[in-house]
């Protein structure tokens, strides 16, 4: 017998661990660096103003992976930027432009605060049908949002949202299901927030208001076996790593790495090499996030 999530190939009760096979990389995620203007409680990637564990990705590093995908016809449709706070990376606008110029749907995750607002002119010039800005908001009430994100984090976020709306950007919201409130209730309460702030968001849309299952590596969650797909009536293709990868630049490394999952940037088991081609290998679901967030939670970062 093993402890849970210890053996790559077998679960604690000695059953074959579920795995994912990848054929196309529909979504390429780029972590622009872990530095952030906020230090949110429970940040899965531990971003804050001092954490540079993932260094800033340069434009040339980004470009090499995009070109690899294009040249090898890997089926990429969307490019996503996450952090940290992407707008703190000086090359972010060059990266967004290159993504759009090559015809990719482009998604930027942001807190919509000063790093974005201080660069409004640069962002405005890139406004495009294929560009979507996803703004993180941890609650529809200021008090609870600031419990997670810290004091004075609400008003700048609202300012950023209203600027995006006024300037006709494609934008959406992302929130966490962490308040002992079911998703239906959360969406109903967000309708009031959206109406009060005159935003162009449909709270019933799972695309315009994205809800994420809460992640806690220490909480107990079942391991996923090869038998679970049939039991749960789920398909491997529904799991994020079946069609996506994330590129990160670890501070101690000379070259960026390709990671299986946006949620596991520091776990060496999910580091798949330095090229997209190398990364096309089986991904064994050997982490609590694989179970709770992706398979049972049905969440996806894209």
Description of each model-found segment:
Residues 67-76, 202-203, 251-255:
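Intrinsically disordered, low-complexity coil segments
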Residues 2-83, 87-105:
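Conserved alpha-helical substructure of the radical SAM core
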Residues 50-64, 86-129, 133, 137-156, ...:
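Canonical radical SAM enzyme core domain
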Residues 46, 139-141, 171:
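A short small-residue
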Residues 69, 124, 194, 198:
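Conserved hydrophobic residues forming the short capping helix/wall of the S-adenosyl-L-methionine
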Residues 75-80, 106-107, 130-137, 155-221:
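Conserved C-terminal portion of the radical SAM core fold
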Residues 69, 99, 126, 161-164:
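Generic structural signal for hydrophobic
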Residues 213-302:
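Accessory C-terminal segments flanking Radical SAM cores
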């Amino acid at each position: 017998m093993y402890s849970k999530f210890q053996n790559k190939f077998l679960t604690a009760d000695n059953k074959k661990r579920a795995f994912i096979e990848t054929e196309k990389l529909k979504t390429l995620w780029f972590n622009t660096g872990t530095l952030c203007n906020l230090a949110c409680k429970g940040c899965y990637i531990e971003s804050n103003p001092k954490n540079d564990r993932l260094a800033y990705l340069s434009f040339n590093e980004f470009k090499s992976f995009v070109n690899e995908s294009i040249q090898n016809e890997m089926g990429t449709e969307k490019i996503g930027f996450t952090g940290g706070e992407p707008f703190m990376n000086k090359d972010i606008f060059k990266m967004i432009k290159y993504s759009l110029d090559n015809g990719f749907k482009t998604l930027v995750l942001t807190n919509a605060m000063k790093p974005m607002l201080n660069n409004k002119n640069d962002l405005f010039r890139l406004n495009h049908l294929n560009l979507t800005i996803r703004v993180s908001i941890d609650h529809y009430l200021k008090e609870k949002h600031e419990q997670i994100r810290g004091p004075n984090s609400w008003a700048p976020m609202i300012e950023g949202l209203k600027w995006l709306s006024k300037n006709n950007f494609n934008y959406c919201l992302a929130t966490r299901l962490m308040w002992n409130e079911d998703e239906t209730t959360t969406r109903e309460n967000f309708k009031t927030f959206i109406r009060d702030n005159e935003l162009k968001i449909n709270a019933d849309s799972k695309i315009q208001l994205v809800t994420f299952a809460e992640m806690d590596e220490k909480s107990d969650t079942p391991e996923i076996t090869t038998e679970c797909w049939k039991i749960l009536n789920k398909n491997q293709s529904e799991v994020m790593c079946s069609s996506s990868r994330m590129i990160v630049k670890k501070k101690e490394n000379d070259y960026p790495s390709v990671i299986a999952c946006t949620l596991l940037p520091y776990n060496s088991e999910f580091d798949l090499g330095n090229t997209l081609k190398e990364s096309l290998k089986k991904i064994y679901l050997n982490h609590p996030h694989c179970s709770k967030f992706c398979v049972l939670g049905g969440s996806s970062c894209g």
